Amino acid sequence: MTPPPARRSRRTDGDSAAPRLALPRRGSVRRSQMITTYGVGSLIAVDNESFVVSGIDDAHRSWALDEAPIIHEHRLARVLGVKHFRLPPASEDTSKDGVRVRRFPLWHSCPSCQCLQHIRDFNPPTNKNVCTDCDDEPLVPSRFVVACEDGHLDDFPYWKWLHRKNREDGATGRCGGQMSMRFSGRSASLRSVIISCTCGVPEVSMEGSFRRSALTDLGVRCEGRRPWLKGAPAEFCRQAPRTLQRGSSSVWQPVLKSALSIPPWSDGLAAKLSEHWETLRSFSSRMEIEIYLKGAFRGDDSVTADAVMELLAAEQEEDPDRESNADAGAVSPYQVLRRQEYERLCSGNALRDKGREEQFICEPPVSNPAVLEPFGVARPMLVKRLREVRALKAFTRIADAESSSESHEAALSLTPTDWLPAMEVSGEGVFVRLDESWLDEWAESPAVAARVEQLRTNHDRMLQERATDPAEAPVSPATPRLVLLHTLAHVLINEWSLDAGYPAAALRERLYTDDTMAGFLIYTATSDSAGSLGGVVAQGEPDRLAEALHSALRRATWCSADPLCIEAGTSGIGGANRAACHACAMLPETSCEYNNILLDRALLVGTPEDPSVGFFRQVLTA
């Protein structure tokens, strides 16, 4: 990872398009972390230095195409309003560029002389982070930064914090003194972080700086700065600034959107047509398409007018805006994507009907699924090959993406781009669908409705507390159907982690649940093009799936934390769980779509006082 220098020559030698000098390499991270952990706008610590990952405005110059190839997922791109996606660059040691970073925070302290000031006042040599007055002692970046819920980021206002009652003669921070930071060592709390100034003001500690209104009470407002965007002007902002630890997860949280590649977009043809799609879409007749294809794909018989017409028809049929309007705006575009995937997972897509480039292979098992009828499970589907694209749409600060509206999402670039950074992963999985008539009958039980209503109320309260404006807070998706399917997916992943050879962290859930959907996909997905070796698909054969379900449900009847767990009125973050804990139903966070909330194993197996709330109670008592 490399920071952009203040002045960079774009002159070239001969025919080479590369700069004369390679930029200094600051460190490296895994490619997937550029989407999930160290994406645009995040802070990354490298040795004794700290940087913010730059925006993608200049990525067309710094991300080489051979290191950061273009990938396509038509359905997701259309919803996100872009043409394509790009993988973060996988740079070699000889690469002259890559993901750019910028130094942040700019305030540093010297552990030797305890001086606290802007890094430029230390006068360090170029590309070094040292105190020249202390024999090149490495400087320490500020532990504290300031952020707001609109995504702005700034240095902590140390001068204003220290001179809170003595700012008449130095309101702009020019009191003539030299600030310093020291640690008293009396405790590990903020009370031990002492700020002082040679101008004579009383020294203060950092205690209280993390209060929600601590900076607002001092008259400090958000300056609207976006240091990850080169040349970005400050924005007017009404949000209250908040103090955060530089390494806190609240400083940066990704807004990720994903989609599976499904027919007719999954056979490689859509990728070939991507550069020509806008032109093809403008044609009104088959003859125009045929003439264009003869010129654009001369000698390539795989691209036919019939195939293009099929894709054009599919695009119109799958238009999220069209379906949302049909449902009176009640369905989000992302839910439309899920419905399309659900329909394809239910219908299947056999390998024998497709070529080697097909990225979605979904077939029913060969054996009779009658053994699953007592569980209320419809015919499972074996997803022998899948491709998922996960795109970084934006990011949030302080409030998580779940409880934030789009108005609080921070952009990845100063000007809109026609692409977003993304990862593509390949894998396999098993799709499980429950009988909807059984679900509807079970969900009508007053006891079931009461348990879920309490969970939903707690989740709604949590979302409103986290939201800047409670009126804009999203509504909890908790329903009996969702909580049941979510908890079942969790216990089944835990069971398969013991039987399929994959750790729970290597498996993921993808839930399909609303009034018309009742299923989930458990899959393994890796960045390797080969995906995995069939161990998960084998678990979807009816006999093995029945055994796994029975074993998982038996395990769910007892938890090492019982009776506290099963009798808990509420548990988890914000009380958004009921009978669920790390000993029975929770998973690694990377495996769960809802961050380990909206879980209740009592809906699977019942409680000692009321077994009837369990959907699978008859299987367990048989």
List PLM regions with ranges.
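Extended, well-ordered protein cores
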Residues: 2-162, 178-184, 191, 219, ...
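Extended charged low-complexity segments that act as oligomerization/scaffolding linkers
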Residues: 183, 187, 193-196, 201-209
